[in-house]
From Swiss-Prot:
Main location: other
Localization (cell): Cell projection, Cilium; Cytoplasm, Cytoskeleton, Microtubule organizing center, Centrosome, Centriole
Descriptive protein name: Tubulin epsilon and delta complex protein 1
Species this chain originates from: Mus musculus
Coiled coil keyword on record: yes
């Protein structure tokens, strides 16, 4: 009897500990009491969960950029983010923006985000304290996949608007490049001036954070507090992984408390049309008309096809056709070789898939273990060459299409835009 009672008490303590560990992992995580109230759909838990989902779904909210928004705007951002990620429950989207309803649905949305991907790992990576100057994380694209299907726009697109958007994009891209160049110059100066000041021989120089600690000792205390907070989050993540099963068992009970009027996956009702007896006769007459049209089309197309085959029957032979066929085969082989080369370059394991610390090394010194800047530049240059080649090919295709359209419309003059 005592053993059974202790087992029940242990299971009762495991759930609050699991929820508390999850709360410590999340940014500005709510208390476990909020989770308990959300299970019973209490209205006081809804505002806290709206803010939590905003911080989880929006990278800008981590910097307190969107936390000052009105509750209606926060709810709109959360709904659009969940919809873009394919959230299956439409019940949450039906609640009015900024209302205190649907705390249980918000809890289900949070659990869906936790179950579908490495959410905690991404949040921990965003709040990680950086002690060294690191190379920004980037991922080499692998196979681009099939092209996206063409979607006809609902309204005509103004060409001036497209040109204006392209101009804004180019301007922001140039601003980004100039800021990156300025940052690289400042980093190089710091690494050069602090050469030989680091205790580790493999590094040799100080980073920006370490230089800031020497310049302002109070920032060292802030950095220490940030490291302690990060350790607390990492310990909470480890505890969450040990007690995760208890939380998901509890979420099963939360899902069971949902009313039958709000099923897990809503679907549009299907209506079958009713066909009367008169409609069957009309369908039969339409079928006969279609068959007659098919026979007429076959009678017209067969003579034309025979005449076309007789006209081109002697073509495809001779030295000119063999030379053109050989040129086409060589072009196809070159294109396949270029595609294979870009695939091999994008799938090499030596490319950076995580942040790397920037270390200044002297000429002729032994290379440390890590990623060299020359390798990154070489990879990016090869990728740039492949993209430029694809761009030139698309431009040629567009020019050929414009020439074809100009030939089809003799009364229209096509004026190409000036090259930039």
């Amino acid at each position: 009897m005592r053993r059974r009672r202790s087992r029940v008490e242990g299971a009762a303590r495991a759930l609050p500990e699991a929820v508390a560990a999850l709360s410590r992992c999340l940014p500005a995580g709510p208390s476990p009491e909020i989770f308990r109230r959300a299970k019973f759909d209490r209205p006081e838990a809804a505002p806290v969960l709206w803010q939590l989902l905003l911080r989880v779904l929006s990278p800008l909210a981590a910097n307190n950029t969107w936390t000052d928004l009105a509750p209606e705007a926060q709810a709109c951002v959360v709904k659009s983010a969940l919809g873009s990620q394919g959230y299956p429950r439409s019940v949450l989207l039906q609640f009015p923006d900024g209302s205190s309803q649907g705390s249980r649905e918000l809890l289900l949305a949070l659990s869906w985000l936790l179950a579908r991907g490495p959410l905690l790992e991404q949040l921990l990576a965003q709040t990680r304290v950086q002690l060294g100057d690191q190379l920004p994380q980037w991922e080499a694209p692998t196979s681009p996949g099939p092209p996206a299907p063409f979607v006809e726009p609902k309204s005509p697109v103004d060409l001036r608007l497209v040109e204006w958007l392209m101009g804004r994009l180019r301007f922001r891209w140039r601003c980004l490049i100039s800021s990156q160049q300025e940052q690289c110059i400042l980093l190089s100066k710091i690494h050069l001036y602090t050469q030989g000041c680091h205790s580790q021989q493999s590094l040799g120089h100080l980073s920006v954070a370490e230089t800031e600690m020497l310049r302002d000792p109070e920032s060292g205390q802030q950095l220490l507090q940030a490291l302690e907070s990060e350790n607390i989050r990492l310990e909470a993540a480890l505890e969450w992984r040990r007690r995760e099963l208890v939380f998901w068992q509890w979420m099963d009970t939360v899902l069971d408390t949902c009313s039958p009027e709000t099923p897990a996956v809503t679907s549009q009702p299907t209506f079958l049309p009713e066909i009367s007896e008169g409609g069957l006769g009309e369908l039969e007459s339409v079928k006969q008309e279609l068959q007659a049209l098919q026979e007429e089309l076959r009678e017209v197309s067969e003579p034309r096809r025979a005449a076309w085959e007789a006209r081109v029957g002697g073509l495809g032979q001779g030295p000119e056709w063999s030379n053109s066929r050989k040129a086409l085969q060589e072009a196809v082989q070159q294109e396949l070789a270029a595609l294979q080369g870009s695939w091999e370059q994008s799938s090499t394991p030596g490319q950076p898939q995580r942040p790397h610390r920037l270390v200044r090394s002297k000429d002729g010194a032994p290379r440390p273990q890590g990623l060299q800047a020359a390798e990154v530049i070489r990879t990016l240059s090869a990728k740039e060459a492949c993209l430029k080649k694809a761009l030139h090919q698309l431009q040629r295709q567009c020019q050929q299409e414009l020439a074809r359209l100009a030939g089809a419309l003799p009364g229209l003059i096509w004026i190409l835009p000036p090259e930039h």
